[in-house]
UniProtKB/Swiss-Prot annotation:
Stated name of the protein: tRNA uridine 5-carboxymethylaminomethyl modification enzyme MnmG
Gene Ontology terms describing biological process: tRNA methylation; tRNA wobble uridine modification
Residues binding NAD(+), per UniProt: 274-288
SMART domains assigned: GIDA_assoc_3
Amino acid sequence: MIYDYGYDVIVVGGGHAGVEAASASARIGAKTLLLTHNIDTIGQMSCNPAIGGIGKGHLVKEIDAMGGVMAKAIDMAGIQFRILNSRKGPAVRATRAQADRVLYKKAINSLINNQENLDIFQDSVDDLVVENNTVCGAITKTGITFRAKKVVLTVGTFLGGKIHIGKVSNAGGRAGDQPSNALAARLRSLPFRVDRLKTGTPPRIDRRSVDFSVMEVQHGDNPTPYFSFFSKGKIEHPRQIPCYITYTNNETHKIITDNLDKSAMYSGLIEGIGPRYCPSIEDKVVRFADKERHQIFVEPEGLNSIELYPNGLSTSLPFEVQCNYIRSIKGFEKAFIMRPGYAIEYDFFDPRDLKPTLETKHIKNLYFAGQINGTTGYEEAGAQGLVAGINAAISIDSDKSWYPTRADSYIGVLIDDLITKGTKEPYRMFTSRAEYRLILREDNADLRLSDKACELGLLSKEDQQHFISKKNAIIENIAMMKNTWIGPQTQKARDLEKFLDKKMTRESTLFDLLKRPEIDYSKLQQISELNLNLQDEAVIEQIEISAKYSGYIERQNKDIEKTATLEQKAIPTDFNYSQVKGLSNEVLQKLTEQKPTTLGEASRIPGITPAAISLLTIYMKKTGFIK
């Protein structure tokens, strides 16, 4: 049966990538269908109940700047907020929020259920409609065909998903859900490179069986920060509660070591590679054998939940062993496990087979986003979903495309890393992956991306006005401060010298004075004659950072300008690299396989030398491909 409602875009999967993809597509105005195997699990946090962190918080802020839903949802559902690295520079500060699982899912559903142009249908997708190497729709398990101009696959860990607890294995996309084996087989029949990855989750513990009095208490920040640029004054956070910290010990490690042969990972049952930066507890004990203890964050799953998430204890050991090692940990001596931990293995497809828009190179109008591309984490998934949804929508009746770059966002870094380097392990975002960290800060994500969001129609009128007002206030106040002078031996100078190490000897602008480490905006406000009445903390923050880091920011902007030349030089998709004399066989093979879209992208493919890029540039200039 064909269920034809004239959809422009179909999004398959209702996780974090799917929600952002469907929401972005619908906000742009495309008639969008979200197909999910279970409407009740849309927006579900399958693993840890938290959003953000180092590098990840940057992604959430960027999704928000483009009108996405993740930041607003966590503002509605967050039960503890912290700014990580708050004592360090602004480039590496990151927001992290503990979530109430129930409230988060409720918030996501509220946001997408009120989204115009978006329909939701419950059924598993078993097949794709592909005609002349172009996707035209999706076929569900019950035999319903939905046709559309674009299809976005955001299927998480469901493709060929296999759950492992010790030596017991069963098919599953996550605990309690069936895998998408038919769709996995269909995708394997298409010309994509495919491999297996693994991730895992810890056992959940009944909080009533835990002794918190022997653990370290970890409180959130006060005042409580917001994730979204648009939430303050409109969204009220839920009640805030603490998390706790405990540690493994030698007894814990001995129990794990003595039972390694029973672990699915160490017994050879699991083929896929797990996440390097979120290893299982058995992996930690083996890889860091010299460490006497490992930190465990004891995280509540919600205000009204009795479940605790012991972050740091992901495992594939048998349930009996899980019980033993959990009870060896301080505070967990009488712990009751409510759900066993498990590892899950699943198919992923080589992201080097994708364009920067996340459209596949082999099947036209088909987009991949999330764990199908080899990433791990809600934030990485949401970021990809956003880009895929945008491009699916804006290219319906044209050849328009938009994708972020390494110079304007962490989303750009994420996608560029994936499509140029690929991945052999679950990819996680860190600030260290970005070259231009001082420019790609959490605090200025809206200033970097929201103009484009306005242009694409991704922001609501209210959010658009909020952004424009903030941007104008920053521009106007910086201009005023650059044109306001204080001369020596004036009353203003004498008032200012209370905060300085020495007397002023020359005339300075307020902006130059703000560059000094001992001066901040609040001190300038104390000089009554200056009449500095600005109260908006977000605007003040941008003014201070612009002044204090102006030299570094200027240098990074110059670096970006140098590399922009290569980024702007497009390579045709049918370009014949064998015509370029002097390229080695290795370079020729890699360029032919990956089909980079620009010289900049080509330069970042592992094994592509500067000499090869020079030869390519000379040939393209000589033959008229570039000027």
